């Protein structure tokens, strides 16, 4: 039985201040059990692992970004921060490459023990400058709704200051997925962002069906980021220059 899955759903962003701004887009995501990548490569037509296809997943799009083992990268960082790294299962929720192109503003790693209890969450955040920051959380209680919070440590939007806090909420993947991020400054909520989806089996039929619903999803995501940024600028929202250049940072959060 394959544990990996496909989720079709939507992304919502709502900005509350200094001016209200809202958008919603339909997307599909893959939830990949990293131990199944070679099986998926062999069994699912039009999907490939670390090589070109209509739909593909490359390890170099995540982790160290050098094509090295993503499983090893996860385990190395769990060990570094004293989180269980042996006898675990790793799943990643992300957008796939479509015709070789992808941009993942957020990828989520779900780390389970062998009893299928969630023990850690990694939020891998990217910006359009090719930079990446991963927030690692230890999960102390296996519940369906996981909640995490931390200070913002990475420049994402040029229209939001760095002096902010994130409040993450997510459901353990099942028939549905849900990832919600609320962003606050010292006074009020600035942003609500969410991604949800409904599960389908990871097979050729459902993969092609998802692709046909979203044939240019990668390009739509990239264009949407810039189009929505233009609309924010046109509304007169202050442009905040990026001050610090990083490549690939990782922090452990409480």
Name each model-derived stretch.
Residues 1-254:
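Mature, function-bearing regions of proteins
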């Amino acid at each position: 039985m394959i544990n990996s899955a496909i989720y079709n759903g939507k992304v919502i962003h709502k900005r509350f201040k200094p001016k209200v701004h809202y958008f919603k887009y339909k997307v599909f995501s893959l939830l990949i059990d990293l131990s199944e990548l070679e099986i998926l490569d062999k069994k699912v037509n039009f999907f490939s692992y670390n090589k070109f296809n209509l739909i593909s997943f490359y390890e170099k799009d995540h982790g160290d970004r050098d094509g090295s083992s993503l499983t090893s990268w996860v385990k190395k960082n769990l060990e570094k921060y004293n989180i269980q790294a042996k006898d675990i299962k790793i799943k990643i929720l992300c957008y796939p490459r479509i015709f070789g192109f992808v941009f993942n503003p957020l990828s989520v790693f779900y780390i389970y023990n062998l009893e299928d209890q969630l023990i850690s969450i990694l939020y891998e955040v990217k910006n359009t400058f090719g930079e990446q920051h991963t927030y690692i959380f230890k999960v102390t209680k296996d519940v369906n709704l996981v909640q995490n919070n931390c200070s913002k440590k990475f420049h994402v939007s040029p229209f939001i200051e760095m002096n902010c806090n994130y409040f993450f909420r997510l459901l353990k993947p099942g028939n549905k997925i849900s990832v919600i991020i609320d962003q606050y400054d010292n006074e009020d909520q600035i942003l609500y962002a969410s991604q949800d989806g409904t599960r389908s089996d990871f097979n050729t039929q459902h993969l092609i069906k998802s692709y046909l619903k979203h044939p240019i999803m990668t390009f739509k995501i990239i264009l949407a980021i810039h189009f929505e940024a233009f609309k924010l600028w046109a509304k007169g929202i202050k442009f905040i220059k990026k001050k610090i250049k990083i490549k690939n940072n990782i922090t452990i959060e409480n």
